[in-house]
Amino acid sequence: MLQGHERSITQIKYNREGDLLFSCSKDQKPNVWYSLNGERLGTYDGHQGAVWCLDVDWETRKLITGAGDMTTKIWDVEYGTVIASIAAKSSVRTCNFSFSGNQAAYSTDKAMGQNCELFIIDVRNADSSLSEQAPTLRIPMVESKITSMLWGPLDETIITGHDNGNIAIWDIRKGQKVVDSGSDHTAGINDMQLSKDGTMFVTASKDTTAKLFDSESLMCLKTYKTERPVNSAAISPILDHVVLGGGQDAMEVTTTSTKAGKFDSRFFHLIYEEEFARLKGHFGPINSLAFHPDGKSYASGGEDGFVRVQTFDSTYFENIFE
């Protein structure tokens, strides 16, 4: 159990090797932890508002964060210093490095008279001058705001999940939408996470389901049904398993006993769509989930401000569907 945030966790992410776990919360300070023993290595101090999103690049050199103080910041992971701070006109809701680490994308909220927009910036030679440079691409979102985002294969596309349940793929060379999912989800998308090989991704939605989609055609492959909104979902890198986390909206939560089972991590079989396990722990909804890159443990971040890292025992790796 990692205790270091004063307010609810908004997102957690492992780096590629899995030795570091990054977490951000509404208390303005993203943290980095040793995933093996839960030791806090440091804090990235500089935001003036709730930090909504973060991502770490392939080489664990740069960290990008987006916050309610209307800035996106790029940090030096090792030294904790701000490399660049980019101002936006509303809260920054999502941010992601591309696989190559040459580009980063972030999106802003529809608020204060501003439309939601998707920005792509070049971060190859990131320094303080980045805040003055124009983004390499800027796409206004007219219909519905972006609530989650992924880079597609070969850094050629961006997949966006929206507040109205829609999913779209954008070609960043043309700057236009190339695929639209239609209305597979009937409510907002809270989270999207790719499979290890990038061919599929799982969505978590307020419509109480998580769905598995093809990364290129946006065809819905599988549906995992629950009784309450799903805040986060992740795909195991080694087994055909999906973990879902959620609960009620934060504002609807009363002090419920954990026995009610509302705030469990729920494991589903990727192919058979069957739930086979639940893990308790959080005293509130789970806001973010991440599998360790080796698939032997996973982490969850909750509305209670804690990050829990849980290691699987040997029985988890036995095929229970034989």
Curated annotation (Swiss-Prot):
> What InterPro entries does this protein's entry cite?
eIF3i, WD40/YVTN_repeat-like_dom_sf, WD40_repeat_CS, WD40_repeat_dom_sf, WD40_rpt
Organism lineage string: Eukaryota, Metazoa, Ecdysozoa, Arthropoda, Hexapoda
**Native species:** Drosophila mojavensis (Fruit fly)
Q: Name one Pfam family in it.
A: EIF3I
Q: What is the protein name given in its UniProt record? A: Eukaryotic translation initiation factor 3 subunit I
Q: Which SUPFAM superfamilies match?
A: WD40 repeat-like
Provide a Gene Ontology MF annotation, just one.
translation initiation factor activity
Name the predominant localization.
cytoplasm
Where the WD repeats fall, as residue ranges, is: 4-43, 46-85, 141-180, 184-223, 281-322
